[in-house]
Amino acid sequence: MPTLAETFLRRPHGVLEYVADAVRVVAALSVVVVGVGWGVVEIAVLMLALLGTLVPRMLGLRATFDLMVGVAALGAAWSSVFELYTRITGYDTVVHFVLNGLLAAVFVVLAHRAGWVVSPDHGDGRGGAGRSARVGSVLVTVAFGLAAGTLWEMGEWAGHTLVDSAIFVGYDDTIGDLAAGGLGSLLAGLALPFLVGGDVRGRGARASSPGAGVDGADGRGVDGPGGDAVGHGRPRIHHR
């Protein structure tokens, strides 16, 4: 199994991985841009977004998931810079629904790598044990999402109180954001097998395990030609 550093420094394969890396470059440049044209709050927001784009690559998440997290994190950060949350009614709720759910799924992957929870890529969920594992993964994702949403709201309150009173906070806003984040996390939990299936580290483990075979006679994988989620064409285990 490759280390986090090895996974992060590997060469991209497939169009989606190159696009996800381009998003990371844009995020890094965005930190420089806000450092010149905006203030400390905006710099902190874009640095958090940059971190959000880097973690999926360190974890070797499948390209689709990686790209979704990067675009959502960067979009949410720039939306804050341009104050879109207060200018567009309901926009804040949509961002919480999408980003909170994706981040909850990332946290579940981190927890699995640390050995705290079972694998979120738990197959088809058939049988009592499989169904229990699937339900458990969904519940853990929702729990992570609600916890992340709470920390998010606490951060907004701290920013409003200690840094800039222009940061919008309010009871209705907080409850609505937490509810949206919880629903997004529920959806992400249900989609975990798709989101984490075919990630780089998982493919490496499957490729090196006994009995691995080519996934499909034509070498196509879940994300198109080339075999796996990002077009590597590497061996994978057939589920029987």
Question: What are the residue ranges of the model-derived segments?
Answer:
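Primarily interfacial, aromatic-capped hydrophobic alpha-helices that serve as membrane anchors
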Residues: 176-240
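Alpha-helical transmembrane segments of multi-pass membrane proteins
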Residues: 53-57, 72-79, 104-108, 144-152, ...
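Cytoplasmic-side transmembrane-helix entry/capping segments in multi-pass membrane proteins
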Residues: 62-75, 92-98
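Alpha-helical transmembrane segments and their cytosolic membrane-interface
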Residues: 1-43
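Membrane-interface helix caps and helix-loop-helix hairpins in membrane proteins
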Residues: 33-39, 82-91
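Interfacial helix-loop-helix junctions of multi-pass membrane proteins
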Residues: 85-92, 150-186, 190
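Membrane-interfacial alpha-helical segments at the cytosolic side of multi-pass membrane proteins
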Residues: 98-118, 161-167, 182-196
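Internal alpha-helical transmembrane segments of multi-pass membrane proteins
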Residues: 115-146
